[in-house]
Amino acid sequence: WIMGHMVNAIERVDEFLNLGANAIEFDIDFDKDGIAQITHHGIPCNCGRKCTKKAIFTEYLDNIRQVTTPDDPKFREQLVLLALDLKLLRISSAKAYRAGEDVAKKLLDHYWQRGNSRARAYILLNIPLVEDYEFIRAFKDTLKNEGYESYNDKVGINFTGNEDLDKIRDVLEILGIHKQVWQADGITSCFARGTERLKEALEKRDTPGYNYINKIYAWTLVRKSIMRRSLRLGVDGVMSNNPDRVIKVLKEKEFADKFRLATYNDNPWEKFRG
């Protein structure tokens, strides 16, 4: 999976897909009451990127629904995964449950259209810290209460704050989540990051019977040398400001026979058995 990073403007979706991304990440900003308002990162962000692009969240969902709906004029077959970077650190932890309710309802109304949409992308909920786990509980409660629990099959969980992996496992146990879990490891593209935690996560992913990490991606990679390093370690995905660079690396002799781009037929919740 090649995740285009910080794709917050509607017009940038096609741009990142044209560069080779088959997944996009966008930031969701909330008001003080936990209501999702806009797709917006804000300052500071990655080196070499403008942080101010934005869109109204519901309008963004309306557009991305079309982009991921077969036979729609805007349909782009390659886009199979949407990563929602939830800016929960900007609101009180007490509002995390309200935020989860709101995002679930907006997805129901504007993306899935309560069963009337054929939009097919998988959804990855990126939670910054384990202390915000009530967002996940609320999201799942809302799908159940609204009568759409079946959409849980399309939704995965990911904690992005580089926290202790055992602490993350404990929270997933509290929530009763034993599948459909990604684990991110990374840092802003402005800095270098070691591989100790990434290697630990990969070891857990590959441990038989360990159900708290199904997939792993590294972020935010812009240097080809770091992309190569991550691929050698065996990541499932790379988040980048430059999807075209990832494409070029994947075509190199060392990787061409080992990796390919994920398609809709590849389940993002299953461990890869090579």
From Swiss-Prot:
Family per record: Belongs to the arthropod phospholipase D family. Class II subfamily.
Cofactor binding comment, as recorded: Binds 1 Mg(2+) ion per subunit.
Organism encoding this protein: Sicarius cf. damarensis (strain GJB-2008)
Gene Ontology BP, a term: killing of cells of another organism
Tissue: Expressed by the venom gland.
Protein's name in the database: Dermonecrotic toxin SdSicTox-betaIIB1bx
Regions annotated as coiled coil: none
Top-level enzyme category: lyase
Known EC number: 4.6.1.-
Residue numbers annotated as active site: H5, H41
General function of this protein: Dermonecrotic toxins cleave the phosphodiester linkage between the phosphate and headgroup of certain phospholipids (sphingolipid and lysolipid substrates), forming an alcohol (often choline) and a cyclic phosphate. This toxin acts on sphingomyelin (SM). It may also act on ceramide phosphoethanolamine (CPE), lysophosphatidylcholine (LPC) and lysophosphatidylethanolamine (LPE), but not on lysophosphatidylserine (LPS), and lysophosphatidylglycerol (LPG). It acts by transphosphatidylation, releasing exclusively cyclic phosphate products as second products.
CDD domains to which the protein is assigned, alphabetical: GDPD_like_SMaseD_PLD
